[in-house]
Structure formats: C-alpha cells, structure tokens
C-alpha cells in the first residue's frame, strides 16, 4: 500500500479484515459492545454485524414470529420422539430416591442451608410453576422455561441457576426419559416429602421446550419496575405479577411501601390470576414459607455480578457471582431479605402460622437494607438456628407480604382455622401445591405416572367418559344425512363448530370441542358465540342426537362429536358447491361435560374478546390491536402462518363471520369453499380506503369509484403485510384452487382435534 492513497472505504475494509483475522481484537470489541448495565434494556446502539428485524425499522409491522417459534427442528429428539412412552419407562421410585439422596449431599461450590437443599428446590419448583396466569394460560412449569431467558435471569429467580445445576446429575442419568420440566416439579415434591410432608401426588408428562416462549411479561423496560396498573390500581391484563421480574408481589410491600393491607390486595389479585382462591393462597404462602430462609447478607449492588443472561461466557450460564465473603453460605444474597420464618426450617410444622399470629411484629431492615419484620418479643430473638454457622441463632422474620395474611380479615380467619386444625392445613397445602404445579397440564388424560391421584379436580375441566361416542362408518353417514336435512345452513354449522373448537388454547391446554361446553354456561352466553344463533343450532342438533341415540343401542353419539360432525358436513357441502369432492376426516370419541363439571368462573377467563377468524373484535376488552389479536389467537391454536392464512380466507368465503357480517366476505358465492377472498383481495381493480366507521375499510372500483366490498384490518393485513401477502398469493393462483380446499380442510381438522 506504500505510496498509495487509502480512501475511507479501503480503510474500513482493512479494519474489518483485521477483526476477522484477529480473534482477540474481535472478541474484545464484541465484549465491549455487549456490556451494559445490569438489567438494562437495549440502549438503541446497534451491535456490530447484527441483522435487524423489520420491527427494528418499522415497529408497527405485524410480528408473525409467535407462529414460528418452537419449531420441531429445534428439538434434538426429533418429531417422532414419544415423551409419554419414555417417561412411563422410568422407575419413578428410583428417580425419587436419587433426588432424595442429593438433597443432603451438600456441595462445596454451593453449600446447602441447614445441610438440606429441600427448601431451595421448593423455591425452584414454586417459581417454575408460579408464572402461570389464568387470563391467557401462559407461564407455568410446562416446557421448563425457567432454563431460558428472561425467566432464568429474573431477580426473583436469583440463585435458582444453582438449583438446576445441583439437579444435573439426576437429569444426566435419566436423559430424555425425564424432562427438565418434570424434574423441576418432582424435585419440589421429593423435597417436601424429605422434610416430613405428605404430598397429594405427582404427574409427569410435561414436554420440554428448546427455546424461550414469546410471552408479554409487562410494559416495563427495567427489572423490578412496576408500571402496570391503571389509575384505579387495577393490574393490566393479562399479567399476574405486580413487578417486572417478580413471580407474584413485592415482598416489602406495594412498590416497596411496608403496607400489609395494601400487600394483601396485591396478593389477592396476583394469586387469583393464578387460579387460586383465598384458602389456597394462604395455604401456599404459609406452607412454602414453613421451609428455608431468605438471603440478604450484603447489599446486592455491592456484591453481586450480572445475572446469567448478562454474565460472561466463562460463567457457563451461571449468574449473580457474589464477591463478598465466601460468596455463598452465610454470605448468600438473593432477594436482599434475610432470615427464616420458623425455628425448624427443614421440617413440616405449623410454626409459620403460630409465629405469624402469636407475635407482634416490628419493622426492621436486613443487612442488605430490605424492609422486613421481627417479633417485638425479644425472648425469641435467638430461636432460629443459623443456616451455616453452628451455635449462632436469630429471630424469626416476616415480610410485609407475610403480615398481610395476619392483618387482612379474610386471610386471618383462614390462618386461625388452619392453626387450630393441623390436618386441615396439611391437606389444604397438599392440594394447593398439587394444583400449583399441575395447573398448566390440561385435562387428566395428560397426567402420567403411578403417583397421579384418583379422580378429577374441577380445575382439570373433567368430561364424563361414559358419554364418549362409539360410532361406525354407517352411523357417521346416517348422522351426516340427518344434519344435511335439518335446515341448518353451511354458515350456521361452521360457526358453531368453530366456536366450540376455537375456545382451545395451547398455553394451558384448556377449552376445545371435547366436552361440548359450547352448550353450557358461560360459553353458550359469550358475545362472540352469538348466543341466539348458538341456542338455535344446538336445539336442532340435540333433536338429531336424541333421535339417533334412541335406536342406536350402545353406539351413542355425544353432542361434542355431533357439533364437529356438523362442521365437517358443512365443509363437504360447501366444497361440493364450489366444484370439489372432499371427505373431511372425522374421528369420533369426544365426550360431553355437565354443568356441574364446569367451573363457570374459571371458564369465563377463556372468553374470546377478539377472534379474527370470525372477524370479531371487542375494543373495550382487547389489549392488542385486531391484527395482533389474530396472531395471538392463531398462536393459541398452534397454527402456522399458512394455516392461519388459509383458515381466514376460507372462513370468509363460508360466510362464517360474527353475526353474519359481510366485512371481508370478498366473494359473490358466500357459503361455498372457494379462494375468492384471496383473488379479490389482491385484485388491483379495487382501491381500498378508510370508511367513516372506525376499523372498517371500503373497497372501491378503481375506475368507477363504486363500492365493491368492506373489510377490517384483519382482512386487509393479508394484502398489506409482505409475509402474509406472499402466502395469500399462493392461494390466489389459478392453479391453487384444489390446494386451497385441501389446505383449508387440513387446518380445520387440526383445530377440531387440538384438545385430543
């Protein structure tokens, strides 16, 4: 290069080359660029060579990534792996024995409090399951999401990285036969049993995830921030926790204010959104806080390093390195609170309730500066043994959240009752713990193993097995014929079948066609289901069912099956009218639930306030835009982008909109299964513009200006969004008419069978 002028472009190329060929320089630069304050959000500075998503440049672009996550290609076991079969091959007694042995084998790199990892594992289990929330069914123990960001780096999960590492020998031994998500829950059960508690049961069957869930955990951009309540103090839907990075509530009190009654309000909200009533809430808190201690030996900001997600590569996924004292044992720091609740932290007792109700409590601070409480009675200030230093004793402690259970009148009544009746208390905690750790597993058929308790709980949405259909091919043909002669239109049958099946959500495997709860309260009265039409169609189908069952002997048809069959017959009729012969796959065997088997309050949380597939949107109750809610619903139905696309187009052609609205019905042949929606949406002779009605668009003839169609944003997004348009074009091809019908039927059948 000597004697030549080096321009800026050449210089830049040289610098890039140096980075490529000098790993030390490249790593140093990468490290510098990745370093940011603990818990900080992105600063806006672009990381070198990092591609940017379209949402980076255009934040309002619809994000379709929820429909592409958890791809089977991410699973190292492959699509054909049968986890249920693998789990059932385990010797569960031996697995539990291995965990039990591990509990008291204290490791030098992370010594056990009181010589027992039991309380530590209980916290791990609780925090894994406790992310579950009822409003959208997301969170929970399933998938083992505690292993991944952001949960593995939440402040409330500090040190739980070590708990999972302690369990690694057990996981390594049993491999694919024992998922992390099952192991994390089982470890909590074994810990309880080790410390003298009789658990209610355990069910395996949780499949592991291989990547983080895309979940909205709150609006905040900093950990421990709280900006999720409206002016009336109501927690934003669908959230359950009060702060970013916490499982439930701030233990020091609302936004750090030591107000027990205010804390009680937050606790009631948070636990109710986790499907727990007051009795279950108190049992869980009291039972959980019977064991172990809190850790706040020093101020976190002075001692703790970065959380796992921000720690250096050499940390190998561990975080919160503690540079103070030993870095563990009596120098351990997690929440910043310090101390144990009871005098026997590794035994099942009623001491938590006794301490809470017996003593008056005075406010103090932990060594880390966190607000907590100790008894005013100094005689018990040396009652609690130190977790690591022999001969050292402390006072029992309570948090503001604990005192909420004493000062809230309703919680106190329950606490006093439990203290007076230890067996009632034990059973209440056992059942609440079982519910906590199994709430996101769906119906009882998903529960595996010898320790599954007999019977069904109401929260498992039971269905009467005796009502399951046992139909022959001839029976199905006979029923289809009766349905076709009933006078029910294609649209009516399609709407009812969709309403029944589309209540399903994969997040906690609730809802769906099985059980025919579309005929029961509260589902039959949901606005989205058009109650008047639903009642009419159900009445007709009930008559067909009664007539068939009268002479069918043991081959009875359930209402659940008949609803799905009515939808299938409607599709076959609509396809035939469009010129296609289709046999819609139908597999009987669904049963019917009773009203007594249906918790109305619990099922009310499944109500759809937006269903883009029916072009329904309730602006007063939806927390996202119509198009975002469409993607959210498609995600809950486990749909891919093409499946979502073909279903919307087909349902519009079938005239299946809410209350028969014509928005997006871009066809002159409504009620037939055709691809007109895509053909007409992409037709350049149509000019789309906003109408005078908010959320409604008008399609005008580009030449004459005459109105042709109306549509919503959910319809137009398939022509506007580049990714969706690419798929829509496929279904608009002249050569894709058969493909459209086949793909629609396949996606429809998938939705009908999601809960099976």
From Swiss-Prot:
EC number from the UniProt entry: 1.11.1.21
Alphabetized InterPro entries for the sequence: Catalase_peroxidase (IPR000763), Haem_peroxidase (IPR002016), Haem_peroxidase_sf (IPR010255), Peroxidases_AS (IPR019794), Peroxidases_heam-ligand_BS (IPR019793)
Catalytic activity of the protein: H2O2 + AH2 = A + 2 H2O; 2 H2O2 = O2 + 2 H2O
Assembly and interaction partners: Homodimer or homotetramer.
Cofactor note: Binds 1 heme b (iron(II)-protoporphyrin IX) group per dimer.
EC class (word): oxidoreductase
Signal peptide: 1-26
Function: Bifunctional enzyme with both catalase and broad-spectrum peroxidase activity.
Name by which UniProt lists this protein: Catalase-peroxidase
Example GO molecular function: heme binding
Annotated site (Transition state stabilizer): 123
Record-stated family: Belongs to the peroxidase family. Peroxidase/catalase subfamily.
GO biological process, alphabetically ordered: cellular response to hydrogen peroxide; hydrogen peroxide catabolic process
GO cellular component, one term: cytosol
Keyword Chaperone set for record: no
Active site: 127 (proton acceptor)
PTM text: Formation of the three residue Trp-Tyr-Met cross-link is important for the catalase, but not the peroxidase activity of the enzyme.
Gene3D superfamilies: 1.10.520.10, Peroxidase, domain 2 (1.10.420.10)
């Amino acid at each position: 290069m000597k004697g030549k002028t080096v321009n800026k472009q050449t210089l830049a190329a040289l610098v890039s080359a140096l980075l490529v060929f000098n790993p030390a320089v490249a790593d140093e630069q990468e490290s510098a660029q990745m370093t940011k304050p603990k818990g900080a959000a992105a600063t806006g500075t672009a990381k070198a060579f990092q591609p940017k998503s379209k949402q980076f440049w255009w934040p309002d672009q619809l994000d379709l990534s929820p429909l592409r996550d958890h791809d089977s290609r991410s699973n190292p076991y492959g699509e054909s792996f049968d986890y249920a079969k693998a789990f059932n091959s385990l010797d569960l007694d031996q697995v539990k024995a291995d965990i039990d042995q591990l509990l008291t084998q204290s490791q030098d790199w992370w010594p056990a409090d009181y010589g027992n990892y039991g309380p530590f594992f209980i916290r791990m289990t609780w925090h894994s399951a406790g992310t579950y929330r009822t409003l959208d069914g997301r969170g929970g123990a399933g998938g083992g999401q505690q292993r991944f960001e952001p949960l593995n780096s939440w402040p409330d999960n500090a040190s739980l990285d070590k708990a999972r590492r302690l369990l690694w020998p057990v996981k390594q031994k049993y491999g694919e036969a024992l998922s992390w998500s099952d192991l994390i829950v089982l470890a909590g059960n074994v810990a309880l049993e080790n410390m003298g508690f009789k658990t209610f049961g355990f069910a395996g069957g949780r499949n592991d995830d291989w990547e983080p869930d895309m979940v909205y955990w709150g609006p905040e951009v900093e950990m421990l921030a709280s900006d999720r309540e409206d002016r009336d103090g109501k927690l934003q839907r669908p959230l359950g926790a009060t702060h970013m990075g916490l499982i439930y509530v701030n233990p020091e009190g609302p936004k750090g204010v030591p107000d027990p009654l205010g804390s009680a309000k937050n606790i009631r909200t948070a636990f109710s959104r986790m499907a727990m009533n007051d009795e279950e809430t108190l049992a869980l808190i009291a039972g959980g806080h019977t064991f172990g201690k809190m850790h706040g030996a020093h101020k976190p900001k002075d001692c703790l390093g970065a959380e796992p997600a921000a720690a250096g590569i050499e940390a190998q996924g561990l975080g919160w390195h503690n540079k103070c004292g030993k870095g563990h044992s009596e120098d351990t720091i997690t929440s910043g609170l310090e101390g144990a609740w009871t005098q026997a932290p590794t035994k099942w007792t009623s001491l938590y309730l006794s301490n809470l109700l017996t003593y008056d409590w005075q406010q103090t601070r932990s060594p880390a500066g966190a607000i907590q409480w100790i008894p005013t009675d100094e005689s018990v200030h040396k009652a609690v043994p130190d977790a690591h230093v022999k001969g050292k004793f402390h006072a029992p402690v309570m948090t503001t959240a604990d005192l909420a259970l004493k000062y809230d009148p309703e919680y106190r009544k329950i606490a006093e009752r439990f203290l007076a009746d230890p067996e009632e208390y034990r059973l209440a905690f056992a059942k609440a713990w079982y519910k906590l750790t199994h709430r996101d597993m769906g119906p009882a058929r998903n529960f595996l193993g010898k320790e599954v308790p007999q019977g069904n709980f109401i929260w498992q949405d039971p269905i009467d097995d005796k009502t399951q259909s046992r139909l022959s091919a001839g029976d199905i043909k006979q029923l289809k014929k009766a349905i076709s002669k009933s006078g029910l239109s294609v649209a009516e049958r399609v709407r009812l079948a969709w309403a029944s099946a589309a209540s399903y959500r994969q997040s906690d495997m609730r809802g769906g066609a099985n059980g025919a709860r579309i005929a029961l309260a509260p589902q039959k009265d949901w606005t989205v289901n058009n109650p008047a039409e639903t009642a009419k169609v159900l009445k007709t189908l009930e008559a067909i069912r009664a007539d068939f069952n009268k002479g069918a002997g043991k081959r009875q048809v359930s209402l659940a099956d008949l609803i799905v069959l009515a939808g299938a017959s409607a599709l076959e009729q609509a396809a035939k009218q469009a010129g296609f012969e289709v046999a819609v796959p139908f597999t009987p065997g669904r049963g019917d639930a009773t009203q007594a088997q249906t918790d109305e309050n619990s099922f009310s949380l499944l109500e759809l306030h937006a269903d883009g597939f029916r072009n329904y949107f309730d602006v007063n109750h939806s927390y996202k835009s119509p198009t975002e809610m469409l993607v959210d619903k498609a995600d809950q139905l486990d749909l891919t982008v093409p499946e979502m696309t073909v279903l919307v187009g087909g349902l519009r052609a079938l005239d299946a909109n809410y209350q028969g609205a014509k928005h997006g019905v871009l066809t002159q042949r409504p009620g037939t299964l055709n691809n007109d929606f895509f053909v007409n949406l992409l037709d350049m002779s149509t000019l789309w513009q906003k109408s005078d009605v908010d959320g409604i668009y008008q399609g005008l003839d580009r030449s004459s200006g005459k109105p042709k169609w109306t549509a919503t944003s959910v319809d137009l997004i398939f022509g506007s969004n580049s990714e969706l348009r690419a798929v829509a074009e496929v279904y608009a091809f002249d050569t894709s008419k058969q493909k459209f019908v086949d793909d629609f039927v396949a996606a429809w059948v998938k939705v009908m069978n999601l809960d099976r």
